[in-house]
C-alpha cells in the first residue's frame, strides 16, 4: 500500500449558495406588513493551506473528490441563511497547483500559504432585500448560484537546500542517516529508496535540509529504472551533491563514467524544467559537490585518489567520505553549509532588489456613469440560416443563474436588469429583431430564449404591473363616469335581448303562456296611454 504520494488529481467543488426566501409579514392589525424574506447564505469554498505537519499528498490519493458545504436558504421573518463552512485542505510545503493543461496556478511556499481552489456560490437575495419604492412587495427572490468546479493536479516539490543524487546503492540514504537524525530504509540491494527522504543538518551556525531521492541509472530520461519521476524534488535545491560509489564491482562502471551519466540525465530533466519555467536556474548551472563514498574499503580509497585529480581539474570540489566510519563528514557538512549560506544571501539580495525597484502604480479606475459595455460582449452567429446572438459576461451569466424562470415576476426583473445594463440597446444597435434567438452563457449550459424588447413585452407576461405583488395591491374603485357607461351598456344589452325574443315569438318559434300574454298586453297598453 502506498505511503508516499507526490502527484494527485483533485476534483474540487465549492458549495452552492442558498436560495433567497419569498415571504410576507403576517401580524395581527398589520394587513400590509411588507416583505420579510431573508437572504440565502454563501456556499463554502475549498481552500488549500500549507501545513508544516503534512509531508505527503496521500490523503488526496484516497479521497480525490472534495466538496464544500452548501449555504443555507433564507427564511421568513428576516432570517438569513448561514454561510457554508469553508473546507480547508492541508497540503505539504512546496505543493504546486496546476490545471489539466499543465499551467501553474499556484506555488504554495511557507507555513499558512493559501489558495482558493474552488470558490463557493453566492447566496440569493430574499424579497425583503429586493424591495424598492417602486417594487414594495416583490413576489420573488433570487436563487443561489452554484459553486465553482475545478479539476487540478497537485504536485509536491520538497523544500530542501541540498539534494543527494547518484546511482542506486551509492550510499545516499546512509549519508543522510549519518549526517542527520533521519532514519531512511537502508539495504544492500538497488532501489531501496522509493520515496524522497529529508534530513536536517546542523553545521556550525547554519541549519539546512538535505534531500535523498531515489537512484538514477543511464536511460532514466527514457523511463528506465524509476525514471526521472522524483527529480522534481531537487528543483528547489540550492546545490547538488553527486554521491559516487567507489567500491562498485559492476563492469563498465567507474566514478568518471558514473558522473558523466548523472550529468547527462540531469541535462535531459533540466531541459524539461526550462520549457515549463524559463525563469528558474537550470540544474546544470547550480553549484555541485562530488562525494567519493565508501573509502573505508582499500580498493575504493585507491580509486578515489586516482580520479580525484581529474575531477578537480573539471572544477568540482571533491570529498572522500565513509558513511560507515564517518570519515570526511564534518568537512562535507561545512562545505554544504557554505553553499547554502551563499545561496540564501543571494536570495536576500534579489529580494531587496525587488523591493527597491519602483513599482508603477496604475491610474485609479474611476467608475463611469451610465452603462459600461465592457461588462458584456455580444456576438452574432448564424445557426441554420437563423441569427443567434451570444451574450457573454460575468454579470449577465450570474443573473441568469439567479433567476427562477417559473416566476413571471422574476423574469420581468431579469429583463429590467438587462435593460439597465444596456444589453437591449446593444442588441438594437447590432441589428437584432424581436423574435431572434439570444443565448446567454456558455454553449453547454447557457439559456436560450426568443428576444422580446421590454417596451412591447413585460407587463403581459406578469398579468399585472411588473415589479409589484398583486396580493398586496389595493383594488381601484371605478369613477362615476365609468359607472354611468357600464349602466348604459347593460340597459342596451337588455333592450337588444327583448327585441330578439319578440321577433322569435312573432315568427312562431315559441309561444307564451296566458299569464305572460296578459302581462305583456297590460304593459303595452300602459305604455300607449303614457304616450
Curated annotation (Swiss-Prot):
An annotated Gene Ontology molecular function: GTPase activity
Cellular compartment(s) = Cytoplasm
Which amino acid positions bind Mg(2+), per UniProt? 173, 193
> InterPro entries in the record, alphabetically?
G_OBG, GTP-bd, GTP-bd_Obg/CgtA, GTP-bd_prot_GTP1/OBG_C_sf, GTP1-OBG_CS, GTP1_OBG_dom, GTP1_OBG_dom_sf, OBG_GTPase
Quaternary structure per UniProt?
Monomer.
Cofactor or coenzyme needed: Mg(2+)
One Pfam family matching this protein: GTP1_OBG
Compositional bias (Basic and acidic residues): 468-507, 514-531
What EC identifiers does the entry list? 3.6.5.-
| Entry keyword set | Cytoplasm, GTP-binding, Hydrolase, Magnesium, Metal-binding, Nucleotide-binding
Q: Where is the Obg domain?
A: 2-159
**Quick check: keyword RNA-binding in the entry?**
no
Q: Kindly list the positions annotated as binding GTP.
A: 166-173, 191-195, 212-215, 293-296, 322-324
Enzyme class at the top of the EC tree? hydrolase
Q: Which organism is it from?
A: Kocuria rhizophila (strain ATCC 9341 / DSM 348 / NBRC 103217 / DC2201)
Q: Where is the OBG-type G domain?
A: 160-341
General function of this protein: An essential GTPase which binds GTP, GDP and possibly (p)ppGpp with moderate affinity, with high nucleotide exchange rates and a fairly low GTP hydrolysis rate. Plays a role in control of the cell cycle, stress response, ribosome biogenesis and in those bacteria that undergo differentiation, in morphogenesis control.
Cellular component aspect of the GO annotation: cytoplasm
**UniProt protein name:** GTPase Obg
Residue ranges annotated for the OCT domain, each copy included: 368-453
- Biological process, per Gene Ontology: ribosome biogenesis
Amino acid at each position: 500500500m502506498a505511503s508516499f504520494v507526490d502527484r494527485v488529481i483533485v476534483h474540487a467543488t465549492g458549495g452552492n449558495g442558498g436560495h433567497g426566501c419569498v415571504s410576507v409579514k403576517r401580524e395581527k392589525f398589520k394587513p400590509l406588513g411588507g416583505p420579510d424574506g431573508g437572504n440565502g447564505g454563501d456556499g463554502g469554498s475549498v481552500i488549500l493551506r500549507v501545513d508544516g505537519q503534512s509531508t505527503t499528498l496521500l490523503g488526496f490519493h484516497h479521497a480525490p473528490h472534495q466538496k464544500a458545504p452548501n449555504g443555507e436558504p433564507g427564511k421568513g421573518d428576516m432570517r438569513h441563511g448561514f454561510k457554508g463552512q469553508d473546507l480547508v485542505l492541508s497540503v505539504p510545503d512546496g505543493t504546486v497547483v496546476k490545471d489539466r493543461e499543465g499551467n501553474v496556478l499556484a506555488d504554495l511556499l511557507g507555513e499558512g500559504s493559501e489558495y482558493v481552489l474552488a470558490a463557493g456560490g453566492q447566496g440569493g437575495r430574499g424579497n425583503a432585500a429586493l424591495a424598492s419604492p417602486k417594487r414594495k412587495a416583490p413576489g420573488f427572490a433570487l436563487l443561489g448560484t452554484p459553486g465553482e468546479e475545478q479539476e487540478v493536479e497537485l504536485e509536491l516539490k520538497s523544500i530542501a537546500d541540498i539534494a543527494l543524487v547518484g546511482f542506486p546503492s551509492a550510499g545516499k540514504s546512509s549519508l543522510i542517516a549519518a549526517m542527520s537524525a533521519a532514519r531512511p530504509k537502508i539495504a544492500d540491494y538497488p532501489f531501496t529508496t522509493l520515496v524522497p527522504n529529508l534530513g536536517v543538518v546542523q553545521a556550525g551556525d547554519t541549519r539546512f535540509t538535505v534531500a535523498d531521492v531515489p537512484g538514477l541509472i543511464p536511460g532514466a530520461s527514457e523511463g528506465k529504472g524509476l525514471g526521472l519521476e522524483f527529480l522534481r524534488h531537487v528543483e528547489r535545491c540550492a546545490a547538488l551533491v553527486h554521491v559516487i560509489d567507489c567500491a562498485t564491482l559492476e563492469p563498465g562502471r567507474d566514478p568518471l563514467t558514473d558522473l558523466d551519466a548523472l550529468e547527462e540525465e540531469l541535462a535531459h530533466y533540466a531541459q524539461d524544467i526550462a520549457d515549463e519555467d524559463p525563469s528558474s536556474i537550470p540544474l546544470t548551472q547550480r553549484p555541485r559537490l562530488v562525494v567519493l563514498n565508501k573509502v573505508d574499503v582499500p580498493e575504493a580509497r585507491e580509486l578515489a585518489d586516482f580520479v580525484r585529480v581529474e575531477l578537480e581539474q573539471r572544477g568540482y570540489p571533491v570529498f572522500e567520505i565513509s558513511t560507515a566510519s564517518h570519515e570526511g563528514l564534518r568537512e562535507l557538512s561545512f562545505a554544504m553549509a557554505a553553499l547554502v549560506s551563499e545561496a540564501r544571501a543571494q536570495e536576500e539580495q534579489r529580494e531587496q532588489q525587488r523591493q527597491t525597484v519602483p513599482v508603477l502604480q496604475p491610474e485609479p479606475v474611476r467608475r463611469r456613469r451610465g452603462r459600461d459595455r465592457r461588462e458584456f460582449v455580444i456576438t452574432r452567429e448564424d445557426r441554420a440560416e437563423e441569427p443567434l446572438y451570444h451574450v457573454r459576461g460575468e454579470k449577465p451569466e450570474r443573473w441568469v443563474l439567479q433567476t427562477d424562470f417559473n416566476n413571471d415576476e422574476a423574469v420581468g426583473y431579469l429583463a429590467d436588469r438587462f435593460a439597465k445594463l444596456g444589453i437591449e440597446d446593444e442588441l438594437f444597435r447590432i441589428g437584432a429583431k424581436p423574435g431572434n434567438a439570444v443565448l446567454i452563457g456558455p454553449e453547454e449550459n447557457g439559456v436560450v430564449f426568443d428576444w422580446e424588447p421590454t417596451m412591447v413585452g413585460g407587463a403581459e407576461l406578469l398579468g399585472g404591473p411588473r415589479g409589484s405583488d398583486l396580493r398586496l395591491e389595493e383594488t381601484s374603485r371605478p369613477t362615476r363616469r365609468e359607472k354611468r357607461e357600464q349602466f348604459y351598456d347593460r340597459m342596451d344589452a337588455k333592450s337588444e335581448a327583448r327585441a330578439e325574443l319578440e321577433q322569435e315569438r312573432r315568427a312562431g318559434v315559441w309561444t307564451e303562456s296566458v299569464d305572460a300574454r296578459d302581462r305583456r298586453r297590460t304593459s303595452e297598453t300602459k305604455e300607449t296611454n303614457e304616450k
